C-alpha cells in the first residue's frame, strides 16, 4: 500500500514577520545546511525571529537565522548564526534583486519546513515594512471582526 502524503509541518514560523511587514510575494527556496543543522531542524530547534535574506554577488544568503547546536554532534557542530546560502533560480534572484533595490522592500523568511522529499525549504517573502499606525489599524480591524463574531454567536443562542 502507498503511504498517504504527510502534511507539511513547519519546523519554524516567523509569526512576527506578518505583524511587522506587508507581504507582497512569497517564494520557496532550498537551503544549504550541514548534517548537524538538519538534525537540529528535525528537532525543531530553529529561530527565525530576526532573520532576513540578502543578495550578494548574484547569490542569496539567509542571515541571523539561529539553528541551535546539535547536542550529540560534539566537536563537529556548526555555528548557530552563520550565513546560509539559499538555492533559487537565477531569474528569480535577478527579479528579487530588482525589487529589493527599490525603497522599502526586504526579504524575510516566513517559515522553514521539510517538503515531501525530506528536503529543508524556506518560504521567503518579499515584504515592505509596516508603520506603527498600520499595525494599529490591523489590531482595530481584528477587534471589530471579533466583536461581530461575538454578537452573531450571541444572537443565534436564543
UniProtKB/Swiss-Prot annotation:
BP GO annotations? trans-translation
Q: Has keyword Cytoplasm?
A: yes
Where on the tree of life does the source sit, at the highest rank? Bacteria
**Where does the UniProt annotation locate this protein?**
Cytoplasm
**Ranges in coiled-coil conformation:** none
Give the chief site where it resides. Answer: cytoplasm
- Give the protein's biological function: Required for rescue of stalled ribosomes mediated by trans-translation. Binds to transfer-messenger RNA (tmRNA), required for stable association of tmRNA with ribosomes. tmRNA and SmpB together mimic tRNA shape, replacing the anticodon stem-loop with SmpB. tmRNA is encoded by the ssrA gene; the 2 termini fold to resemble tRNA(Ala) and it encodes a 'tag peptide', a short internal open reading frame. During trans-translation Ala-aminoacylated tmRNA acts like a tRNA, entering the A-site of stalled ribosomes, displacing the stalled mRNA.
- Entry's PANTHER family? SSRA-BINDING PROTEIN, TMRNA-BINDING COMPONENT OF TRANS-TRANSLATION TAGGING COMPLEX
Q: HAMAP family attached here?
A: SmpB
Family according to the record? Belongs to the SmpB family.
Tell me what this protein is called: SsrA-binding protein
Annotated organism of origin: Symbiobacterium thermophilum (strain DSM 24528 / JCM 14929 / IAM 14863 / T)
Q: Which gene encodes it?
A: smpB
